[in-house]
Structure formats: C-alpha cells, structure tokens
Amino acid sequence: MLGISKKIETASQVDDQLVLPFDRRQKSRLRVELASGTEAALLLERGTVLRGGDLLQAEDGRVVQVVAADEPVLRVTAATPRELARAAYHLGNRHVPLEVGDGWLRLEQDHVLQEMLLGLGVQVEGQMAPFEPEAGAYGGGHRHHHDDDAPSIRQPARLRIHE
C-alpha cells in the first residue's frame, strides 16, 4: 500500500488524483483508492483538511492532486442580499459548515435545515456538487481561552487508518 504523508505547495506534474467528499477530506488517517486504482494510506498531520486542488506527495515521490467529489448538497439563494445574509446567520448560529458563493450558500443535505431555510423564505435546491465550506474565522480547530493555560502534550500518532 502506498503511503502519502506530505502536503506540498507546487509540483511540475501530477501523477494521480484522489477524489473525496468533504467528510473524508477532514480525516488525517484514511485508507483510500486513487483514480488509477492504487490503494493508499493517508497519514497526514492531525487537523489537516484537504481542499480541491491540494497536492500530496507519496513516499515514492508521486504527486497526487486532491479533487473535491460531487456530493449531495443544498444550494441556497434569495431574492435579496438581506434574505441570504439572514439565512447565513441562522446556519452559522447552528455551526453548520457552509460554503459561501457569489449570491448563494451551499451546505450538506439536511432535511431539517432545508425546512428551516424554506421557512425563512429563501430558495433551496438539492444538487450534486463539490462542497468546499469556509475554513472558519480563526483557522484550526475549536478552542477555548483556557486552552492556553494547559501544558502542551503532543499525542503520539496512531497507526489506525479509517476505512
């Protein structure tokens, strides 16, 4: 099995592709199949979130480009910017991962959120599309102010790979 543990910024060529939906692009340890059919193990730094277009380098030097897979999402539009901002506010208040486009919002399919959005008077359309939600205003993971008081203990990497 091919090991992939390095994210790189540039490459002169791409040797293979890795097509994954967003929920799998959030995992740092993952067993995957590349577009060529090659089985690989992602062993990335904890907290790494892959985005479409990211480049990875395998242990044998191959460069693999990440492709955001089409997945079931809801596309939200509104008659006015205020209505769209109101929908974004209510989704953000629920900590919903959200992709923000020019005049639209995109979120993972959820019938409860769809009903809420329709109740707000916006248009909601189910579609298959790549999902690239905002990374968050503060970057990284969820933290609290008291986290800085605790000693920093680096946990050893586990060898478990998600299927």
UniProtKB/Swiss-Prot annotation:
Belongs to the UreE family. SMART domains: UreE_N (SM00988). Residues 134-163 are annotated as: Disordered. GO terms for biological process: protein folding; protein-containing complex assembly; urea metabolic process. Coiled coil: none annotated. The keyword Ribosomal protein does not apply. It is found in: Cytoplasm. Keywords: Chaperone, Cytoplasm, Nickel, Nickel insertion. One of its GO terms (cellular component) is cytoplasm. Involved in urease metallocenter assembly. Binds nickel. Probably functions as a nickel donor during metallocenter assembly. The keyword Cytoplasm applies. It comes from the Bacteria. InterPro entries: UreE (IPR012406), UreE_C_dom (IPR007864), UreE_N (IPR004029), UreE_N_sf (IPR036118). It comes from Methylobacillus flagellatus (strain ATCC 51484 / DSM 6875 / VKM B-1610 / KT). One of its GO terms (molecular function) is nickel cation binding. This is Urease accessory protein UreE.
